[in-house]
Amino acid sequence: MSQNSLRLVEDNSVDKTKALDAALSQIERAFGKGSIMRLGQNDQVVEIETVSTGSLSLDIALGVGGLPKGRIVEIYGPESSGKTTLALHTIAEAQKKGGICAFVDAEHALDPVYARKLGVDLENLLISQPDTGEQALEITDTLVRSGAIDVLVVDSVAALTPRAEIEGEMGDSLPGLQARLMSQALRKLTGSISRSNCMVIFINQIRMKIGVMFGSPETTTGGNALKFYASVRLDIRRIGSIKERDEVVGNQTRVKVVKNKLAPPFKQVEFDIMYGAGVSKVGELVDLGVKAGVVEKSGAWFSYNSQRLGQGRENAKQYLKDNPEVAREIETTLRQNAGLIAEQFLDDGGPEEDAAGAAEM
């Protein structure tokens, strides 16, 4: 009896294998080779290529060393919080690796002088300033489908005004028009983005929901589609000012990874954004170095390998600016221990309902 049962199982197994092979062959004949495969055989899927954000602590918090290519990323936050700065840093890092980047400036507010200061190569940056939301998303789709673009930034979702709204009159009520536009565009874009291995960064603004009694009243523009299609969502906030004597020279910034499909989410980091210079990389090296035990702090003095960097954080930052080889050495050590730093030293904001419905997956 047991032998008959065993033979039946073996026969079923052989039949299933034959049926599966026949089905796979039929799918490949109908839709082309590579339309279906075993996941482990596809090295492109297993190995995720990333681009640095320009912030060491944020790269570590993201868990994969930066923002992923072939995916949609959303950066949102209040006004003047550093959204465009972070996107421009990502473009600069991609260009350093020889990548081609594009910037769809729907807000018509890109400052080329500031972009150059952040390291962006303006001569090789493609820029478009579209008249309507449809035009912006059509340009985005065409560039992505070309397969030649590495990073494409859309600034911002809130400025993607539907054609019907532009051609209409002030005060016309057109509910849900922008949300439908974004939903349709993202359905069309997602497959092309994955195939072309192009990273598309959508910058978004925050709005207030009326009549919310409990929870955060904040939400992002453009409906819910972007929340679902984005592989990474970053909430960026200004939490303080940096002063030299009485003059404000920068912002203290907090970024929370509110959604991450590639690594554990909810990591939270803080760094400085200096006016006219962008993310303070040396400031991050000092702060992360102290947390990880790479840089020693004794009283007000900072030291590395028994070598004094300076008294006070600002003096230590200046020393690293003047001695880039020491800064590179500290950065290399920190990147080598990225997993440990992310696990032990970066704040975990927790999965509570964040601003703008951030925890939606």
UniProtKB/Swiss-Prot annotation:
Give GO cellular component annotations, separated by semicolons.
cytosol
Cross-referenced CDD domains, in alphabetical order? Answer: RecA
On whether Transcription regulation is a keyword of this UniProt record, the answer is no
Q: Phenotype of the disruptant?
A: Greatly increased sensitivity to MMS, decreased bacterial load in BALB/c mice, but bacteria still persist 100 days after peritoneal injection. Increased sensitivity to UV light (but considerably less than expected compared to E.coli), hypersensitivity to MMS, slightly increased sensitivity to H(2)O(2). Loss of mitomycin C-induced expression from a recA promoter. 4-fold less survival in mouse macrophages, where the bacteria has to survive an extremely hostile environment.
Q: Which UniProt keywords apply?
A: ATP-binding, Cytoplasm, DNA damage, DNA recombination, DNA repair, DNA-binding, Nucleotide-binding, SOS response
Q: Where does ATP bind?
A: G77, P78, E79, S80, S81, G82, K83, T84
Some GO term, biological process aspect, for this entry: which one? SOS response
Subcellular localization(s) per the UniProt record? Cytoplasm
SMART domains documented for this protein: AAA
- InterPro entries in the record, alphabetically? AAA+_ATPase, DNA_recomb/repair_RecA, DNA_recomb/repair_RecA_CS, P-loop_NTPase, RecA-like_C, RecA-like_N, RecA_ATP-bd, RecA_C_sf
Q: Which domain of life is it from?
A: Bacteria
Q: Which SUPFAM superfamilies does this UniProt record tie to the protein?
A: P-loop containing nucleoside triphosphate hydrolases, RecA protein, C-terminal domain
Q: Describe what upregulates or represses it.
A: Constitutively expressed at a high level with 2-fold further induction by mitomycin C treatment. Positively autoregulated.
What Gene Ontology terms describe what this protein does at the molecular function level?
ATP binding; ATP hydrolysis activity; ATP-dependent DNA damage sensor activity; damaged DNA binding; single-stranded DNA binding
* Assigned protein family: Belongs to the RecA family.
Q: What does this protein do?
A: Can catalyze the hydrolysis of ATP in the presence of single-stranded DNA, the ATP-dependent uptake of single-stranded DNA by duplex DNA, and the ATP-dependent hybridization of homologous single-stranded DNAs. Interacts with LexA causing LexA activation and leading to its autocatalytic cleavage. High basal expression of RecA may be important in slowly-dividing Brucella for intracellular survival in its hostile host.
UniProt-recorded name of the protein: Protein RecA
- Species: Brucella abortus (strain 2308)
Query: Source gene?
Result: recA
